[in-house]
Amino acid sequence: MSSQRLRIAIQKKGRLSKECQELFKRCGMKFNISGERLVVHSENMPIDLLLVRDDDIPSLIMDGVVDLGVIGENELEEVRLERKALGEPSAFTTLRRLDFGGCRLSIAIDKDEVYNGPQDLAGKRIATTYPQLLKSFMDEQGIPFSTCILNGSVEVAPRAGLADAIADLVSTGATLEANGLKEAEVIFRSKATLIQREGEFDADKAALINKLLTRMQGCIQAKESKYIMLHAPTDKLDAIKDLLPGAEDPTVLPLSRDGAKVAVHLVSTENLFWETMEQLKALGASSILVLPIEKMME
């Protein structure tokens, strides 16, 4: 693995892996991930992907082993707090939050238990895979507690008599409900994030990082945007433009055979709901099309 190539650590398996790979492919990177390979070379860019455990990524960045990493903010902050407590290097630079991997680290208790606030957790034994984040929250609240550290199946700890409550990642809450638990307190909100090691980069690597960031911005913005086309009566054009969400001035073009209407094209950065489309139609708009955008660059 050449030091001249940009080294990016990503999760080998798990909730962030697939979406991370898809993002890089949308950015124009060609690669083939197969079998148990730990290093994958991009076919069209001087980039190497390191496929590792998610909890190894922060340390690889903080120790300067790789240049960039994609990691959930929950895992990143847990490792940062742990290394800081041990006096180990914990510096990194956040380049941007990404548009996937959303979750929250929450304390959950028995579904029948009354909860009035964090003070109700005093003296409880809490099972978690994230002891540093849990400790940070509880210390901030000034609440004494004890920790039961588990590496998986945290939600079964109360039923097994290992703990009174848990602190675990929550997306929908279905797993908690299936185990007779309810969410009581959100400790930390997380999304996937792109991070960079500390230190200088040579001109080629710096330019490649900037290129990736620009393409990521374009991919994420395109995913959140829609291209809207419609025919609008000329006498209702201003009212129709006022209805269109999150839009800059649209492109307005004459129609070849209908002088009473114009074609309106625009990029919307907000969702166009059915109600808005019905209002547009009520104003006389027709041929309303809402299309996804694959890529965009401003």
Curated annotation (Swiss-Prot):
Molecular function in Gene Ontology: ATP binding; ATP phosphoribosyltransferase activity; magnesium ion binding
Organism: Aliivibrio fischeri (strain ATCC 700601 / ES114)
Name of the featured protein: ATP phosphoribosyltransferase
InterPro entries assigned: ATP-PRT_HisG_long, ATP_PRibTrfase_cat, ATP_PRibTrfase_CS, ATP_PRibTrfase_HisG, HisG_C, N-reg_PII-like_a/b, N-reg_PII/ATP_PRibTrfase_C
Cofactor names: Mg(2+)
Listed Pfam families: HisG (PF01634), HisG_C (PF08029)
Record field: catalytic activity: 1-(5-phospho-beta-D-ribosyl)-ATP + diphosphate = 5-phospho-alpha-D-ribose 1-diphosphate + ATP
An annotated GO BP: L-histidine biosynthetic process
Any one GO cellular component localisation term in the record: cytoplasm
Record keywords, A-Z: Amino-acid biosynthesis, ATP-binding, Cytoplasm, Glycosyltransferase, Histidine biosynthesis, Magnesium, Metal-binding, Nucleotide-binding, Transferase
Activity regulation (UniProt): Feedback inhibited by histidine.
Cell compartments where the protein resides: Cytoplasm
Family: Belongs to the ATP phosphoribosyltransferase family. Long subfamily.
Pathway it works in: Amino-acid biosynthesis; L-histidine biosynthesis; L-histidine from 5-phospho-alpha-D-ribose 1-diphosphate: step 1/9
Free-text function comment from the UniProt entry: Catalyzes the condensation of ATP and 5-phosphoribose 1-diphosphate to form N'-(5'-phosphoribosyl)-ATP (PR-ATP). Has a crucial role in the pathway because the rate of histidine biosynthesis seems to be controlled primarily by regulation of HisG enzymatic activity.
Leading EC class: transferase
